[in-house]
């Protein structure tokens, strides 16, 4: 139960704000970001804006061929690595690989879309 009504944050940004507007004047040099769903729609533009602000962006992808094509010239190919969020083993493999060569993660954008499928459980109980 929510004890208080939600209140607007009055940031000046809204549904029609572009990622480049939100990041205008912000220097993200030396920062590392991971954008799930970073190769489609809003995710592509978010990845682009973060790179333009100086950020090193990683875009894990279920369909790496599509991601490589969509993010060509934006995100380096070596930063596009296979990860299927619906597969815990794939996620763990990504985490193991990512954490073995990236010292820190400054920004995490959980942008990947999910489909409302019938509830299922993994062997681990998720």
Question: Predicted segment positions?
Answer:
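Short alpha-helical oligomerization interface
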Residues: 117-126
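Conserved glycine-rich Rossmann-like NAD(P)H-binding loop of the short-chain dehydrogenase/reductase
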Residues: 53-68
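Non-catalytic terminal and boundary segments that flank Rossmann-like NAD(P)-dependent oxidoreductase
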Residues: 1-32
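Conserved glycine-rich cofactor-binding loop
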Residues: 32, 39-40
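The beta1-alpha1 cofactor-binding region of Rossmann-like NAD(H)/NADP(H)-dependent oxidoreductases
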Residues: 81-96
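Rossmann-fold scaffold of SDR-type NAD(P)-dependent oxidoreductases
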Residues: 36, 105-113
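Flexible cofactor-recognition loop at the NAD(P)H-binding site
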Residues: 40, 113-116
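N-terminal Rossmann-fold NAD(P) dinucleotide-binding loop
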Residues: 43-44
